[in-house]
Amino acid sequence: SLNLKDNGFNVIIGQRKNSRSWDKAIDDGWIEGENLFEIEEACKRGSIIQYLLSDAGQIQMWPTIKKYLTKGKTLYFSHGFGITYKEQTNIIPPSDIDVILVAPKGSGTSLRRLFVEGNGLNSSFAIYQDHTGNARDNVIALGIGVGSGYLFETTFKKEVYSDLTGERGTLMGAIQGLFAAQYDILRKKGHSPSEAFNETVEEATQSLYPLIAENGMDWMYANCSTTAQRGALDWWKKFRDAVYPVFEDLYDSVEKGEETRITIEANQKSDYRESLEKELDELRESEIWKTGKEVRKLRP
């Protein structure tokens, strides 16, 4: 919203009054009654409604939001979840509005930071419904407005399939699994926590990943030591072949809506927060990430 505002768009914010998000909006310079309103009032006033709640929040708020989606308005998503899995979310927009998507490939924090620096994140865009005939022009303008470095076209379905696969795969799930496996093996073989962490995580995140981001993995392979090069060339296909079936199972689970069912059912449980904290504590209290906390303190 700040990026759009700074790019000259007429933006109003809808938040629950007296919530942390409301207070943050005020801290960010939004003014109550001028460009900061409660959710229903903002939806009534807005011509393009950016529906940016969490997936669970979107399901909960949909009956409230839907009544303000009058003819000719635009409903904007940053994720294809609610629309793609409409049988489970019950998010079914009226037929006389535009429905579009811009999905930045990173967090809102990163998007804002890069925008302030004069840079941007890559984003996908999609059109689900074009009632007015202006959906394409609007989605591209909004994609640029939110701070996209470049835009590539997709569909709501492909966006959510790739996004859920990525989150459970190389972005978070798989990478944590690889980190944990290598760290545990090194510790089992007698390496110190510091050595195991540095060789597993610290060197990757602080040295190699930035170079890969800048130049590509092909460049990394061509510009490392001969020992590292030979080993990486010999082993990468073994890792690919080992995890390929896991990724096939993962994509099938996403495609069939199983991951959506699990997510929705988990969020609906009365003890979800308590159960979630136990799972997060398992990570927080694991030796690898306790060691990581200490290693980060030693960075220059």
PLM feature spans:
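Small-residue helix-packing motif on alpha-helices
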Residues: 22, 42, 58, 193-197
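Rossmann-fold dinucleotide-binding core
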Residues: 76-168
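Short, surface-exposed connector motifs at secondary-structure boundaries
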Residues: 2-10, 44-48, 121
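Active-site-proximal catalytic alpha-helix in oxidoreductases
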Residues: 133-188, 194-212
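Rossmann-like NAD(P)-binding element
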Residues: 16-17, 26-84, 92-107
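Anion (oxyanion) recognition and catalysis
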Residues: 5, 26, 69, 144, ...
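NAD(P)+-binding Rossmann beta1-loop-alpha1 motif at the extreme N-terminus of oxidoreductases
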Residues: 1-31
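NAD(P)-dependent Rossmann-like dehydrogenase/reductase catalytic/cofactor-binding core
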Residues: 188-300
